[in-house]
From Swiss-Prot:
Protein name: Dephospho-CoA kinase
Organism: Chlamydia abortus (strain DSM 27085 / S26/3) (Chlamydophila abortus)
Subcellular location, principal: cytoplasm
EC number, as in UniProt: 2.7.1.24
CDD domains: DPCK
Length: 202
């Protein structure tokens, strides 16, 4: 019997992963975000920060703070540079997620442990989890969400999407698939259903 089910939420860009995680959290699950963890490492004078500066150049730091927009402009569209950055960040992100899981499991306060990991399959991390939930949405819907939220161009959307593995590959390996082409309320109902199903799996 598992003490605390490890669940990863993944999916393509702007599919609704973060919104699904928000609902899980409201229902009582513990939620951690790989993106937020990686952003927490971006401190100029830290060991990780210095490695990022060595890779991308000092211009990514403005007023003693990493400028994520400058970093994005450098790495999206340059796959080699992007993968080199990920090689610095991702092992540390996985370490933090696993440390946090051990801590949360000891506390015995939460019914589920949820980790939002956008590049779950790309970094070969799926096996660590007990279940994988894939959030999907049609490309035109995702593109519209992305451009509306970020004010970035369609080109920027496709550059970022290039880092993700194919939708078909993710569909093949996911345990649960949640389609998110509708409203936030529709997504909430679907997440609630799976929350109680997963909670009952313990």
């Amino acid at each position: 019997m598992l003490e605390l089910l490890k669940v990863s939420i993944t999916g393509d860009l702007s599919s609704g992963k973060t919104e699904a995680c928000r609902v899980f959290q409201e229902l009582g699950a513990y939620v951690i975000s790989a993106d937020k963890v990686s952003h927490s490492f971006l401190v100029p004078h830290s060991h990780i920060g210095r490695r990022v500066i060595d890779l991308l150049g000092p211009e990514v730091v403005i007023d003693n703070t990493f400028d994520r927009k400058v970093i994005a402009e450098k790495v999206f569209g340059n796959l080699d540079l992007l993968q080199a950055l990920e090689a610095i960040l991702h092992p540390e992100v996985c370490r933090i997620i696993e440390e946090q899981y051990c801590q949360v499991a000891k506390e015995r306060k939460y019914p589920l442990f949820i980790a939002e990991v956008p590049l779950l399959y790309e970094i070969h991390y799926a096996r660590w989890f007990d279940r994988v939930i894939l959030i999907t949405a049609d490309e035109n819907i995702r593109r519209e969400r992305f451009t509306k939220k970020t004010n970035c161009s369609d080109l920027n959307f496709y550059q970022r999407c290039a880092r993700f593995s194919s939708h078909e590959e993710k569909m093949m390996h996911a345990d649960i698939v949640i389609e998110n082409n509708g409203t936030k309320e529709e997504l909430r109902h679907k997440v609630e259903e799976y929350f109680y199903a997963l909670k009952g799996a313990l």
